[in-house]
Design a protein with these regions (language model features):
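Non-catalytic terminal extensions of PLP-dependent enzymes
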Residues: 1-122, 246, 296, 302-313, ...
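Short amphipathic alpha-helical face segments that pack within enzyme cores
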Residues: 109, 135-136, 140, 321-325, ...
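A short, small-residue-rich loop immediately preceding and capping a beta-strand
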Residues: 121-127, 154-157
């Protein structure tokens, strides 16, 4: 398929001006002297081009999307209708509180709902993504220890953690210290004890962790950290597994971020938008970003008066459109959020049990909402996890997350979510088993994959080292 520049012809899609108008409000040295170099196509051809591109995209509405740790669940379309209501769509952030009471009410009630599901005492909706929530949480940790006169420098992070955890800690001014996993894929308690000293500010954990395994010693970890004067940070990337069964507060965490674009069904991918609200226990509430939304019994307000606030972490009030969608999802599901987690865990275990004889399971424990396979057995035959991921594309299935977590060789992280029915799960199982068989009997078809995708084999090394990121039209 040609790119839009290659489709350019002598037809003008739009006439800007005849070139005689003078632009006297911009210094002449900043004005373009040559041609703009934009493609010239008709409106119809532009529409056709981008429609053809959209047809090549893969999305949850098009097929199975088992992208581990991303929770690619179905996003109900009624949420889109609600987010596009005129009263939400056309309001301006500079309007006074009395003019946006409906929007503030929604945000306040979303804060309250997130307090219920997490057990936290106070919530901010500002952060725009999970990693942004992590950074916000780490800034709160930093400000807390500054307020009590302690200059702690270390944050402990499990070796199975998301890569954003050490990055967020570093950005907030901490040094990350890795704690190893044990033979069950959980935090090694003895290794953790050896790392604890008065320079440790916090531990960042995901529970269930990125192996899809529940950290069964979390209460002991909480006790150890608190006895050391340290805080516990909960990465909510895998929160879809535990709703209604437990919450971060019960596990002993002090700070939590949630990914509304994962657990609470708002569309994501392609860089955003997202939302990563942060909740804290009572002793940390004054460190939250401002404003937080409050209710005095009659009216809703934006409260900027938090004594030790870390300040503003996002323009205005967060990604409001995402907040609307998430609140709608919570209202729709209600107490059935617990069933969401039950179904997500059931679906993951169903697939895992059917694939355990065809692929290596590095940690053969009952999993939660996702699990990790290893392609080590297939690698011995010359077929890598990357090869198998590309072969999945020939069956209109999005590849799972691969080569993560880093502690698993040839990793494939599979998360079906609660959205998929048994027929779809069986289809995926059959395709994976077929690929395992092809490794033995017909490896060439895997090595040539994807065979049905619009873009076939690419030179990944060349693309990484010499990316061609723009197009220069000929004069």
């Amino acid at each position: 398929m040609k790119n839009i520049f290659e489709k350019s012809n002598d037809v003008n899609g739009i006439n800007f001006f005849n070139g005689e108008e003078k632009v006297d409000f911009i210094d002449e040295k900043f004005l373009r002297k040559g041609k703009i170099g934009l493609p010239q196509t008709s409106e119809l051809e532009v529409l056709r081009h981008y429609k053809q591109l959209s047809d090549k995209n893969f999305c949850i509405e098009k097929g199975f999307y088992p992208l581990g740790s991303c929770t690619m669940k179905y996003n109900p379309k009624v949420n889109e209708m609600l987010a596009n209501l005129e009263g939400f769509l056309n309001i301006h952030p500079h309007l006074k509180d009395e003019d946006v009471q409906g929007a503030l009410e929604l945000m306040y009630k979303l804060q309250e709902a997130l307090k219920v599901v997490t057990g936290m005492d106070c919530v901010t909706l500002q952060p725009a993504a999970g990693a942004h929530g992590e950074f916000t949480g780490m800034m709160i940790v930093k400000k807390y220890f500054d307020s009590i006169g302690e200059d702690r420098k270390k944050v402990i992070i499990p070796d199975s953690a998301h890569g954003t955890n050490p990055a967020s800690a570093k950005m907030a001014g901490f040094d990350s210290v890795e704690v190893k996993s044990n033979e069950k894929g959980q935090v090694d308690i003895e290794a953790l004890k050896a790392l604890l000293d008065k320079d440790v500010a916090a531990i960042m954990m995901t529970n269930p962790n990125t192996l899809g395994i529940f950290e069964e010693n979390v209460l002991e970890i909480s006790k150890l950290m608190h006895e050391n004067g340290s805080l516990l940070y909960y990465d909510g990337a895998n929160f879809n597994a535990i709703m209604g069964y437990t919450n971060p507060k019960l596990m002993g965490f002090d700070i939590v971020h949630l990914n509304l674009h994962k657990t609470f069904s708002t569309p994501h991918g392609g860089g955003g938008p997202g939302a990563g609200p942060v909740g804290v226990v009572d002793k940390l509430k004054d460190f939250l970003p401002v404003p937080v939304i409050t209710f005095d019994g009659e009216k809703y307000h934006r409260n900027y008066n938090l004594a030790n606030s870390i300040g503003n972490v996002k323009g205005y009030f967060g990604n409001f459109g995402v907040l609307i969608r998430a609140y709608a999802y919570i209202l729709m599901m209600g107490k059935d959020l617990k069933q969401v987690s039950a179904d997500a865990v059931l679906n993951a275990n169903y697939i895992k049990e059917h694939l355990k004889n065809d692929f290596k399971i590095p940690y053969d424990e009952p999993c939660m909402h996702e699990f990790v396979l290893s392609g080590d057995l297939q690698k011995e035959k010359g077929i890598s996890t990357l090869n198998m991921a590309k072969r999945l594309m020939d069956s209109d299935i999005h590849p799972p997350t691969i080569y993560f977590p880093l502690i698993v060789h040839e990793a494939m992280m599979i998360e079906p979510t609660e959205s998929e029915n048994k027929e779809r799960l069986d289809e995926f199982i059959n395709v994976m088993q077929k690929i395992a068989k092809e490794v033995q009997e017909n490896p060439e078809i895997i090595l040539s994959a994807p065979n049905s995708a619009p873009v076939k084999k690419i030179d990944e090394t060349l693309a990484a080292r010499k990316p061609d990121l723009n197009y220069r039209m000929e004069e």
